[in-house]
Protein backbone atom coordinates (compact mmCIF):
# COMPACT_ATOMS: atom_id res chain seq x y z
CA UNK A 1 0.00 0.00 0.00
CA UNK A 2 1.18 3.51 -0.78
CA UNK A 3 0.00 6.80 0.68
CA UNK A 4 0.92 10.44 0.43
CA UNK A 5 2.40 12.16 3.48
CA UNK A 6 3.95 15.55 4.00
CA UNK A 7 7.76 15.66 4.03
CA UNK A 8 9.12 18.41 6.26
CA UNK A 9 12.37 20.28 5.74
CA UNK A 10 14.84 20.40 8.60
CA UNK A 11 15.17 24.12 7.83
CA UNK A 12 11.43 24.71 8.22
CA UNK A 13 10.04 26.59 11.19
CA UNK A 14 6.89 24.45 11.05
CA UNK A 15 6.82 21.91 13.89
CA UNK A 16 6.43 18.28 12.77
CA UNK A 17 4.56 17.36 15.96
CA UNK A 18 0.97 17.20 14.58
CA UNK A 19 1.88 14.58 11.96
CA UNK A 20 4.12 12.75 14.44
CA UNK A 21 1.26 12.51 16.94
CA UNK A 22 -1.18 11.41 14.23
CA UNK A 23 0.89 8.87 12.29
CA UNK A 24 3.69 7.88 14.67
CA UNK A 25 6.38 8.91 12.20
CA UNK A 26 7.60 11.95 10.26
CA UNK A 27 9.99 12.31 7.32
CA UNK A 28 12.26 15.36 7.26
CA UNK A 29 14.58 16.20 4.37
CA UNK A 30 18.02 17.75 4.67
CA UNK A 31 19.21 16.79 8.13
CA UNK A 32 22.63 16.04 6.63
CA UNK A 33 24.31 17.28 3.47
CA UNK A 34 25.47 14.75 0.86
CA UNK A 35 29.05 15.46 1.95
CA UNK A 36 28.23 14.72 5.61
CA UNK A 37 26.59 11.45 4.58
CA UNK A 38 29.67 10.48 2.59
CA UNK A 39 31.95 11.30 5.54
CA UNK A 40 29.96 9.02 7.83
CA UNK A 41 30.06 6.21 5.26
CA UNK A 42 33.80 6.64 4.73
CA UNK A 43 34.48 6.50 8.46
CA UNK A 44 32.37 3.35 8.73
CA UNK A 45 34.32 1.74 5.88
CA UNK A 46 37.50 2.41 7.87
CA UNK A 47 35.98 0.85 11.00
CA UNK A 48 35.03 -2.28 9.09
CA UNK A 49 38.45 -2.54 7.46
CA UNK A 50 40.04 -2.42 10.92
CA UNK A 51 37.64 -4.82 12.67
CA UNK A 52 38.92 -7.97 14.33
CA UNK A 53 36.05 -10.08 15.63
CA UNK A 54 36.81 -13.30 17.57
CA UNK A 55 35.08 -16.44 16.29
CA UNK A 56 32.79 -16.75 19.32
CA UNK A 57 31.53 -13.20 18.72
CA UNK A 58 30.48 -13.79 15.12
CA UNK A 59 26.74 -13.79 15.64
CA UNK A 60 24.03 -12.80 13.19
CA UNK A 61 21.38 -10.17 13.82
CA UNK A 62 17.69 -10.91 13.37
CA UNK A 63 14.32 -9.55 14.48
CA UNK A 64 12.64 -12.94 13.96
CA UNK A 65 11.41 -14.23 17.34
CA UNK A 66 13.02 -17.68 17.30
CA UNK A 67 16.24 -16.62 15.58
CA UNK A 68 16.61 -13.71 17.96
CA UNK A 69 16.47 -15.94 21.01
CA UNK A 70 18.92 -18.38 19.43
CA UNK A 71 21.46 -15.74 18.46
CA UNK A 72 21.25 -12.60 20.61
CA UNK A 73 19.41 -14.33 23.46
CA UNK A 74 22.35 -16.62 24.17
CA UNK A 75 25.06 -14.10 23.41
CA UNK A 76 26.82 -12.11 26.10
CA UNK A 77 28.45 -10.30 23.17
CA UNK A 78 25.07 -8.77 22.31
CA UNK A 79 23.71 -8.01 25.76
CA UNK A 80 26.92 -6.24 26.86
CA UNK A 81 27.21 -4.12 23.70
CA UNK A 82 25.31 -1.09 25.00
CA UNK A 83 28.49 0.78 25.93
CA UNK A 84 30.68 -0.63 23.17
CA UNK A 85 31.09 -0.69 19.39
CA UNK A 86 30.42 -4.23 18.19
CA UNK A 87 29.70 -6.04 14.94
CA UNK A 88 26.62 -8.07 14.01
CA UNK A 89 26.54 -10.04 10.79
CA UNK A 90 24.15 -11.10 8.05
CA UNK A 91 23.10 -14.73 7.81
CA UNK A 92 25.18 -16.94 5.55
CA UNK A 93 28.39 -14.89 5.52
CA UNK A 94 30.52 -17.47 7.40
CA UNK A 95 31.52 -21.00 6.47
CA UNK A 96 31.37 -23.88 8.96
CA UNK A 97 34.79 -22.83 10.30
CA UNK A 98 33.66 -19.28 11.01
CA UNK A 99 35.59 -17.78 8.10
CA UNK A 100 34.14 -15.08 5.86
CA UNK A 101 32.76 -16.31 2.54
CA UNK A 102 31.90 -12.78 1.38
CA UNK A 103 34.01 -9.59 1.52
CA UNK A 104 34.08 -8.07 5.02
CA UNK A 105 32.42 -4.88 3.82
CA UNK A 106 29.45 -6.94 2.58
CA UNK A 107 29.15 -9.18 5.65
CA UNK A 108 27.79 -6.88 8.33
CA UNK A 109 24.16 -6.28 9.22
CA UNK A 110 24.78 -3.56 11.79
CA UNK A 111 27.31 -2.04 14.18
CA UNK A 112 26.23 -0.89 17.64
CA UNK A 113 25.37 0.21 20.12
CA UNK A 114 27.57 3.12 21.29
CA UNK A 115 28.61 4.86 18.08
CA UNK A 116 26.96 8.01 19.42
CA UNK A 117 29.41 8.10 22.33
CA UNK A 118 32.75 6.86 21.01
CA UNK A 119 32.94 7.85 17.34
CA UNK A 120 33.44 11.62 17.00
CA UNK A 121 31.67 12.03 13.63
CA UNK A 122 28.62 10.14 14.84
CA UNK A 123 28.63 11.94 18.17
CA UNK A 124 28.68 15.26 16.33
CA UNK A 125 25.65 14.29 14.24
CA UNK A 126 23.75 12.96 17.26
CA UNK A 127 24.16 16.21 19.20
CA UNK A 128 23.99 18.55 16.21
CA UNK A 129 22.01 21.80 16.45
CA UNK A 130 19.51 20.42 13.92
CA UNK A 131 18.83 17.31 15.99
CA UNK A 132 18.54 19.35 19.17
CA UNK A 133 16.20 21.71 17.35
CA UNK A 134 13.94 18.85 16.26
CA UNK A 135 13.77 17.53 19.82
CA UNK A 136 12.86 20.97 21.13
CA UNK A 137 10.13 21.41 18.48
CA UNK A 138 8.64 18.14 19.69
CA UNK A 139 8.66 19.42 23.26
CA UNK A 140 11.36 17.16 24.70
CA UNK A 141 12.63 18.64 27.95
CA UNK A 142 15.39 16.29 29.12
CA UNK A 143 16.12 13.84 26.29
CA UNK A 144 18.95 11.34 26.67
CA UNK A 145 20.58 9.17 24.01
CA UNK A 146 19.97 5.45 24.51
CA UNK A 147 21.93 3.86 21.67
CA UNK A 148 23.52 4.56 18.29
CA UNK A 149 23.73 2.07 15.41
CA UNK A 150 24.87 1.85 11.81
CA UNK A 151 22.71 -0.39 9.61
CA UNK A 152 24.08 -1.54 6.26
CA UNK A 153 21.18 -3.32 4.47
CA UNK A 154 23.68 -5.02 2.19
CA UNK A 155 22.86 -5.31 -1.54
CA UNK A 156 21.39 -8.68 -2.42
CA UNK A 157 21.49 -10.08 1.13
CA UNK A 158 20.39 -7.26 3.46
CA UNK A 159 18.09 -9.06 5.88
CA UNK A 160 14.40 -8.50 6.47
CA UNK A 161 13.41 -6.59 9.59
CA UNK A 162 10.08 -8.08 10.64
CA UNK A 163 7.20 -5.91 11.92
CA UNK A 164 8.01 -4.63 15.38
CA UNK A 165 7.72 -1.75 17.83
CA UNK A 166 10.87 -0.25 19.31
CA UNK A 167 9.24 -0.14 22.75
CA UNK A 168 9.26 -3.95 22.74
CA UNK A 169 13.02 -3.66 23.26
CA UNK A 170 13.25 -0.17 24.81
CA UNK A 171 10.47 -0.13 27.39
CA UNK A 172 9.61 2.84 29.59
CA UNK A 173 6.97 3.75 32.13
CA UNK A 174 4.97 5.54 31.00
CA UNK A 175 5.10 4.54 27.34
CA UNK A 176 5.49 7.17 24.64
CA UNK A 177 8.88 8.41 25.82
CA UNK A 178 11.17 6.84 23.19
CA UNK A 179 11.82 8.15 19.69
CA UNK A 180 14.13 6.83 16.99
CA UNK A 181 15.93 9.03 14.47
CA UNK A 182 16.69 7.06 11.31
CA UNK A 183 19.08 8.96 9.02
CA UNK A 184 19.42 7.83 5.40
CA UNK A 185 23.05 8.02 4.28
CA UNK A 186 21.92 6.86 0.83
CA UNK A 187 18.55 7.09 -0.87
CA UNK A 188 16.21 4.60 0.83
CA UNK A 189 13.77 3.27 -1.76
CA UNK A 190 11.16 0.54 -2.08
CA UNK A 191 13.73 -1.45 -4.07
CA UNK A 192 16.59 -1.37 -1.55
CA UNK A 193 14.64 -1.79 1.68
CA UNK A 194 13.07 1.46 2.88
CA UNK A 195 10.91 1.48 5.99
CA UNK A 196 7.22 0.59 5.94
CA UNK A 197 4.83 1.83 8.66
CA UNK A 198 1.28 1.28 9.86
CA UNK A 199 0.19 4.90 10.38
CA UNK A 200 -1.47 5.47 13.73
CA UNK A 201 -0.42 2.11 15.17
CA UNK A 202 1.43 3.84 18.00
CA UNK A 203 -1.93 4.47 19.64
CA UNK A 204 -2.58 0.79 20.38
CA UNK A 205 0.12 0.10 22.97
CA UNK A 206 2.44 -2.91 22.83
CA UNK A 207 1.72 -6.62 23.16
CA UNK A 208 5.12 -8.05 24.02
CA UNK A 209 8.49 -7.17 25.50
CA UNK A 210 12.00 -8.50 25.25
CA UNK A 211 13.40 -8.73 28.79
CA UNK A 212 16.52 -9.89 30.55
CA UNK A 213 16.17 -13.27 32.23
CA UNK A 214 17.46 -14.11 35.70
CA UNK A 215 21.22 -13.88 35.98
CA UNK A 216 22.99 -17.15 35.25
CA UNK A 217 20.20 -18.59 33.08
CA UNK A 218 19.95 -19.08 29.33
CA UNK A 219 18.76 -17.54 27.17
CA UNK A 220 19.97 -14.19 28.48
CA UNK A 221 16.84 -12.54 27.09
CA UNK A 222 13.32 -13.77 26.47
CA UNK A 223 10.03 -12.46 25.15
CA UNK A 224 6.96 -11.98 27.32
CA UNK A 225 3.55 -11.40 25.81
CA UNK A 226 2.33 -12.42 22.41
CA UNK A 227 3.71 -11.69 18.97
CA UNK A 228 1.16 -9.66 17.05
CA UNK A 229 0.13 -10.48 13.49
CA UNK A 230 -0.36 -7.46 11.25
CA UNK A 231 -2.39 -6.86 8.11
CA UNK A 232 0.10 -6.35 5.28
CA UNK A 233 -2.34 -4.04 3.50
CA UNK A 234 -2.04 -1.49 6.31
CA UNK A 235 1.68 -0.87 5.78
CA UNK A 236 2.75 2.16 3.74
CA UNK A 237 6.16 2.60 2.13
CA UNK A 238 8.25 5.54 3.34
CA UNK A 239 11.13 6.32 0.95
CA UNK A 240 13.72 8.82 2.19
CA UNK A 241 16.23 10.89 0.28
CA UNK A 242 19.92 10.80 1.15
CA UNK A 243 20.46 13.05 4.17
CA UNK A 244 16.84 12.84 5.30
CA UNK A 245 15.65 11.55 8.65
CA UNK A 246 12.60 9.61 9.82
CA UNK A 247 11.35 10.32 13.33
CA UNK A 248 9.94 7.05 14.71
CA UNK A 249 7.59 6.86 17.70
CA UNK A 250 8.54 4.04 20.05
CA UNK A 251 5.19 2.26 19.64
CA UNK A 252 4.60 2.64 15.90
CA UNK A 253 4.70 -0.65 13.97
CA UNK A 254 7.30 -0.69 11.21
CA UNK A 255 9.34 -3.10 9.13
CA UNK A 256 11.65 -3.32 6.12
CA UNK A 257 11.97 -5.97 3.43
CA UNK A 258 14.98 -7.93 2.27
CA UNK A 259 17.25 -5.87 0.03
CA UNK A 260 17.29 -7.84 -3.21
CA UNK A 261 18.61 -4.91 -5.25
CA UNK A 262 22.18 -4.11 -6.27
CA UNK A 263 22.20 -1.01 -4.06
CA UNK A 264 23.04 -0.80 -0.37
CA UNK A 265 20.92 1.23 2.05
CA UNK A 266 23.24 2.61 4.72
CA UNK A 267 21.63 4.27 7.73
CA UNK A 268 22.78 5.85 10.98
CA UNK A 269 20.07 5.54 13.61
CA UNK A 270 19.85 6.38 17.29
CA UNK A 271 17.16 6.47 19.97
CA UNK A 272 16.22 9.19 22.40
CA UNK A 273 14.23 8.97 25.63
CA UNK A 274 12.50 11.81 27.40
CA UNK A 275 14.05 11.31 30.83
CA UNK A 276 11.84 13.75 32.73
CA UNK A 277 9.30 11.80 34.82
CA UNK A 278 10.22 8.55 33.04
CA UNK A 279 11.34 5.19 34.43
CA UNK A 280 13.69 3.12 32.27
CA UNK A 281 12.91 -0.55 32.82
CA UNK A 282 15.58 -2.57 34.62
CA UNK A 283 14.37 -5.55 32.54
CA UNK A 284 15.44 -3.99 29.24
CA UNK A 285 18.37 -5.70 27.51
CA UNK A 286 20.04 -2.28 27.15
CA UNK A 287 21.20 -0.74 30.41
CA UNK A 288 23.30 2.33 31.22
CA UNK A 289 26.68 1.54 32.73
CA UNK A 290 29.27 3.29 34.84
CA UNK A 291 31.37 3.66 31.70
CA UNK A 292 28.46 5.07 29.69
CA UNK A 293 25.40 6.51 31.42
CA UNK A 294 22.74 7.64 28.95
CA UNK A 295 24.17 11.02 27.83
CA UNK A 296 21.94 14.12 27.67
CA UNK A 297 21.10 15.16 24.11
CA UNK A 298 21.23 18.87 24.85
CA UNK A 299 24.75 20.26 25.07
CA UNK A 300 25.77 23.67 26.34
Where are these regions (language model features)?
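A structural signal for short, well-ordered beta-strand segments
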Residues: 147-150, 181-183, 268-272
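Hydrophobic alpha-helical signal peptides and transmembrane signal-/tail-anchor segments
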Residues: 1-7
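Solvent-exposed residues in well-ordered beta-strands and their adjoining turns
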Residues: 33, 184-186, 273
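Catalytic core of non-heme Fe(II) oxygenases with the double-stranded beta-helix
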Residues: 118, 132-136, 144, 157-237, ...
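Glycine-rich nucleotide phosphate-binding loop and flanking beta-alpha elements
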Residues: 34, 169, 254
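Residue-level "contact hotspot" at macromolecular interaction interfaces
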Residues: 19, 237-239
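Non-heme Fe(II)/2-oxoglutarate
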Residues: 50, 54, 58, 67, ...
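Non-heme Fe(II)-dependent double-stranded beta-helix
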Residues: 8-21, 29-161
Amino acid sequence: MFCFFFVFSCESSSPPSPQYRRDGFVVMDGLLSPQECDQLRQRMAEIVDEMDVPDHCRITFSTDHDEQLKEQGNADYFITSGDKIRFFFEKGVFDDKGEFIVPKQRSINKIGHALHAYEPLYKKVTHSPKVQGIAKKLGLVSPVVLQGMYIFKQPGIGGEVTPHQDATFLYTEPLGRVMGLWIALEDATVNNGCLWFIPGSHNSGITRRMVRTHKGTLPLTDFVGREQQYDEDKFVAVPVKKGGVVLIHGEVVHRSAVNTSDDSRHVYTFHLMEAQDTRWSADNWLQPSEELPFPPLYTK
